Each structure stands twice: as structure tokens, then as C-alpha cells.
From Swiss-Prot:
<dbReference type="InterPro" id="IPR024078">
    <property type="entry name" value="LmbE-like_dom_sf"/>
</dbReference>
<keyword id="KW-0378">Hydrolase</keyword>
<dbReference type="GO" id="GO:0008270">
    <property type="term" value="F:zinc ion binding"/>
</dbReference>
<dbReference type="Pfam" id="PF02585">
    <property type="entry name" value="PIG-L"/>
</dbReference>
<feature type="binding site">
    <location>
        <position position="15"/>
    </location>
    <ligand>
        <name>Zn(2+)</name>
    </ligand>
</feature>
<comment type="similarity">
    <text>Belongs to the MshB deacetylase family.</text>
</comment>
<feature type="binding site">
    <location>
        <position position="147"/>
    </location>
    <ligand>
        <name>Zn(2+)</name>
    </ligand>
</feature>
<keyword id="KW-0862">Zinc</keyword>
<dbReference type="InterPro" id="IPR003737">
    <property type="entry name" value="GlcNAc_PI_deacetylase-related"/>
</dbReference>
<comment type="function">
    <text>Catalyzes the deacetylation of 1D-myo-inositol 2-acetamido-2-deoxy-alpha-D-glucopyranoside (GlcNAc-Ins) in the mycothiol biosynthesis pathway.</text>
</comment>
<keyword id="KW-0479">Metal-binding</keyword>
<dbReference type="InterPro" id="IPR017810">
    <property type="entry name" value="Mycothiol_biosynthesis_MshB"/>
</dbReference>
<dbReference type="GO" id="GO:0035595">
    <property type="term" value="F:N-acetylglucosaminylinositol deacetylase activity"/>
</dbReference>
<dbReference type="GO" id="GO:0010125">
    <property type="term" value="P:mycothiol biosynthetic process"/>
</dbReference>
<feature type="binding site">
    <location>
        <position position="12"/>
    </location>
    <ligand>
        <name>Zn(2+)</name>
    </ligand>
</feature>
<protein>
    <recommendedName>
        <fullName>1D-myo-inositol 2-acetamido-2-deoxy-alpha-D-glucopyranoside deacetylase</fullName>
        <ecNumber>3.5.1.103</ecNumber>
    </recommendedName>
</protein>
Amino acid sequence: MSERRLLLVHAHPDDETLTTGGTIARYAADGADVHVLTCTLGEEGEVIGDEWAHLVAGAADQLGGFRIGELTSALSSLGAGRPRFLLGAGRFRDSGMAGTASAANPRAFVNADPDAVTAAIVAVIRDVRPHVVVTYDPDGGYGHPDHIQAHRIVTAAVEAAGTERFPDAGVPWDVAKLYWTVTEASALEAGLCRIGDLPDGWRLPEPGELPSVPDGDVTTVIDVRGVLDAKRNALSAHATQVTVAPSGTEYALSNDIAQPILVEEHFVLVRGALGDRDADGREWDLFAGVGH
């Protein structure tokens, strides 16, 4: 086993790249053992353009299967190996946004039995034995029910993994550090200010339209300048969901709202102790202070 092991738990294909793609690529390039666990296939995603319109839930309902290929390509670009899905690909369905018909589907991730999915993630933790786990904050970044569910379940699983609970899920393993992936408000604003000409049809976000957290909440910053090409390639691999601008400095989802490709990714430590910090009191390494 590698001396540094990292597990990131995300709700849908593309989430891993949008918020943590640079971090995945950096640690993979540095020789860490990086695992990405995805909870659904993203069947309810809105596609870009007409090329994939026949795949969506209201048509052939084959988008989820197609997105397995996108995720496989994206993770390859990031150097993170093949995808891993919670209890297997397609076991849980994308819930869509709150109040939609898709959220009532019995297979929707939000309707999963909490103990069963907690046990499943405990089993992954005990198998991978990560020093560091990354998932979403309590709001799921932007409020998607599957992100919020992932936050709840991963938090419970990290707490349980080092105990005698779920004895059938493997040998207990204590996770040293748990982080939430977030976007720092000032970094987002600076990135937006650097955006120049936009592709036709794109627009800049209104103030507060993109999710971010106050700068003071951020405990850890990962410099991803050296792996931005890998992140851009991974974003482009999610072609049903993401368009990278010709400039290579911003991207948009199906809503055509421009978002900067930031040179740093931001995290909040919520379990474990902060390691070495800079003059601003922030870590620059997820594994800082971890005894391997």
C-alpha cells in the first residue's frame, strides 16, 4: 500500500473534476494512492446541445451509462485509475433536485437506507484504508440533495469506520483527516475578474449565483497550477455536462454561466488536526501532520 492514501466521495460523474480535479491530479502525480467513489451515475443531468439529447431521462434514459465512459476518461486524465461506484454502477440513481419527480424514485440516492449506505462506505474505507477522506459540506456545495446525502453518509461512515460497528464490513480503520471541498469567496471573485471574452451565449454569474464560502472558513489550500492541463482534459471528458472555453481558463455547464478554472482548490478540515501551516494559518497539504 502507498504511504499516502486519499479517498474522495462524490455524488455524480463530473463532481470529482469540477471541485477536486486538480487535487486528484496533483496527488496522483506525486505518487499517492487516490481513489474516487461515485454514488450515482448522474442520470438526471442536463446535457449540452442536441448531440446527447436522446440520452436524457425523459428520452432513452441512457445518460447514466454514457457518463460511466466520461468518468472513466476523466479519471484517466487525472491519473486516478478506474471508477468505483457505491455498491456497483447504477445501484443508486441520481435524485435530481428537491421536489422533482426523480427524487421520489425508490432507487434515488436520497431514498437509500442510511444504515445500508453507511455500511457500504465503511466497507470502502476499510478496504482502501485512506489517511484522508474528502466529501461535501452540509449544504452539498450548491444544495443538490445527492450532495447533501453524500455529506451525511460519509460523515457517519468516517465516524463508524474505526469502531466495532458494521463487523461484516472489514477490519476497523481510523481516518486521520476528513475535509469538505469548498470554493473560497475571494478566489472565486478574483477568478471571475480575470475572465475576458466569453464564447457566444455564455454570461458571467450574478453576484452570489455561484456557491462559495467566506475566506475565514477555509483551512487548507492546494496549489494545482502544475496540473491544470490534466484538469482541463478531465473537464472536457465530461462533454455532456461541461464545455471548456477556447481560452482554457473558464468553463460552463449547460446553463452557460462562465466559471473560472482556479489555480487553487479549497478545503475545510472537520476531523483531525491541522498540520504545518503558512503565515496565513493555512495548510498546503491534505496529508500535513498525518503519520503514515
